[in-house]
Amino acid sequence: MAKSLRSKWRRKMRAEKRKKVAPKELARLKSALGQGEKGEISMKDVAEIATVVPPEKVKQKPADVDMQEEEADGGKMDLDTKRNKKTMLDEHGRYPVWMNQRQAKKLKAKRVGKNGKPKPKKRLAW
């Protein structure tokens, strides 16, 4: 799909704005890290710029260790919902969240169409 003039213009303007704001943002980051004029770091300033994670969460097991344990358990995911593989519907009659709405509508029409009116039997034409 071709890029519209509007999207190109907006991208260009965002890039110019980034250039304009970059020195100020750099100064904020440096001051938050304590490399600026003051040597102290206030957590309020850091929280404005970045997400603050408590040290307990950082000290927990790394994610790769968790993956190794899951593989050792059998490698199967634990699913809360049961899904019909053919129709992709769960037990409540809903399609998965990742499915496109058009695709869900198409599958529903196909499913409902099968249970519609029966076709008349073919007869001999006299």
From Swiss-Prot:
Keywords, ordered alphabetically: Chromosome, Nucleus
- Database matches in Pfam families: LLPH
Where is this chain primarily localised? nucleus
GO terms of molecular function: basal RNA polymerase II transcription machinery binding
Annotated compartments:
Nucleus, Nucleolus; Chromosome
GO BP, one annotated term = dendrite extension
Give the matching InterPro entries. LLPH-like
Renumbered to this chain, the Basic residues biased-composition regions fall at 1-21, 103-126
- Cellular component, GO annotation: chromosome; nucleolus
The segments labelled Disordered in the record are: 1-22, 53-126
- Tell me, what does this protein do in biology? Regulates dendritic and spine growth and synaptic transmission.
Which family is this sequence assigned to?
Belongs to the learning-associated protein family.
Q: What is this protein called?
A: Protein LLP homolog
Q: What is the lineage of its organism?
A: Eukaryota, Metazoa, Chordata, Craniata, Vertebrata
